[in-house]
Structure formats: structure tokens, C-alpha cells
């Protein structure tokens, strides 16, 4: 790597989750791209190369949305912590998201990541669906 790219990488490593989230939003706006769409294209490629068409419906779904449907009021803080860690949102934004359930927590993520996040939220006291 060049010195410039190494310097940028080191700067990125020092960002907080909130700063990284803001950076992604700014990059999306500046370049007219979407981070979720880029990940989806990469994930769709292996499924597209795989088949003879017989197992189509099972392989077509490569992106999932994690939707917080509801949560146990006694577990609100636990659910809030999991949502904050997963999204990189600040406390106020994460609180608003959790309190406005049903609400999408993450969009367009891989099945394994979606199931893992669903399990985490459910263990914290939330009810989640994958779409």
C-alpha cells in the first residue's frame, strides 16, 4: 500500500461507530452510491452462478432486513444496547428506533448476519422478523 492509503486506513481505525456511520452516509451522498446495494451485488453473485433453476426460490433470497417488531418493556435497555451495537447509531437515534417498533433495524444484510442479529435481539428481549 502507498503511504497515503496507509494513513487513511489508520485514520479510519480510530473512528468511533457513530463517526464511521456518518462517514458512510457522507460517502454515499458524495458519490451517489449505497453501501447496502454494493454488498447485495457481491452477495448475489454466488447464488446467480449456482443453479439449474430447480432450487431457485431458496437461493434467490440473499439479502435480509432485520425488523424489530416489539420488545419486552422490562428489557428495553438490553434491546437498545444490541440495536446500538448493530447499527452504530447514537443513543438518541437508537432509542427512537427501538421505541418506534415495528421498525427495520438493518437492511440488506447476509442471511447469517441477519440470523445472528435476530438471535441477539431476541436474547435481549425483543421480537424480530426477517424479511
Swiss-Prot record:
This protein's GO CC annotations: cytosolic large ribosomal subunit
Output the InterPro entries linked to this UniProt entry.
Ribosomal_bL12, Ribosomal_bL12_C, Ribosomal_bL12_C/ClpS-like, Ribosomal_bL12_oligo, Ribosomal_bL12_oligo_N_sf
| Ribosomal protein among keywords | yes
Cite a single GO MF annotation: mRNA binding
What domain of life is recorded for the organism? Bacteria
Oligomeric state and partners? Homodimer. Part of the ribosomal stalk of the 50S ribosomal subunit. Forms a multimeric L10(L12)X complex, where L10 forms an elongated spine to which 2 to 4 L12 dimers bind in a sequential fashion. Binds GTP-bound translation factors.
Q: What is this protein called?
A: Large ribosomal subunit protein bL12
Q: From which source organism is this entry?
A: Prochlorococcus marinus (strain MIT 9215)
Taxonomic lineage is: Bacteria, Bacillati, Cyanobacteriota, Cyanophyceae, Synechococcales
* Gene that this sequence comes from: rplL
Amino acid at each position: 500500500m502507498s503511504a497515503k492509503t496507509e494513513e487513511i486506513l489508520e485514520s479510519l481505525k480510530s473512528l468511533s461507530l457513530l463517526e464511521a456511520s456518518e462517514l458512510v452516509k457522507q460517502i454515499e451522498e458524495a458519490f451517489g452510491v449505497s453501501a447496502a446495494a454494493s454488498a447485495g451485488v457481491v452477495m448475489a453473485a454466488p447464488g446467480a452462478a449456482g443453479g439449474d433453476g430447480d432450487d431457485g426460490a431458496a437461493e434467490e433470497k440473499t439479502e435480509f432486513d432485520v425488523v424489530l417488531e416489539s420488545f419486552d418493556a422490562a428489557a428495553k435497555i438490553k434491546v437498545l444496547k444490541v440495536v446500538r451495537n448493530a447499527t452504530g447509531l447514537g443513543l438518541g437515534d437508537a432509542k427512537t428506533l427501538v421505541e418506534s417498533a415495528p421498525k427495520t433495524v438493518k437492511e440488506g444484510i447476509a442471511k447469517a448476519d441477519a440470523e445472528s442479529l435476530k438471535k441477539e435481539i431476541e436474547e435481549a428481549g425483543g421480537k424480530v422478523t426477517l424479511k
